[in-house]
Amino acid sequence: MRIGTVAGSVWATKKCPGLRGQPLLLVRMDGKLIVAADLVGAGVGERVLLSFGSAARLEVPDAPADAAIVGIVDPMEEERHVDQ
């Protein structure tokens, strides 16, 4: 899994049957934008957990999804180690 930030929504008036009714969000990750199927109801500005490839397709089985939002990240602190 990877972490990204929701940047906006993607609207597709025509899409394959497996994606009908499936929200699609634009997610910024490592300076790039990707489109991901939203499985958790994430909103713009939220940090999210993303699954990719076959792991994403397990959650969206009838769609050709390469990326899926599978969680919303609570505020977190990065643990820092000090070399002695």
Where is each model-derived feature located?
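Generic structural signal for buried aliphatic residues
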Residues: 11, 48-49
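Short alpha-helix capping/helix-loop boundary micro-motifs
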Residues: 32-37
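Short beta-strand-to-turn element immediately C-terminal to the catalytic PLP-Schiff-base lysine
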Residues: 27-29, 51
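N-terminal first-folded block
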Residues: 1-27
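C-terminal structural segments of small proteins and small subunits
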Residues: 51, 55-84
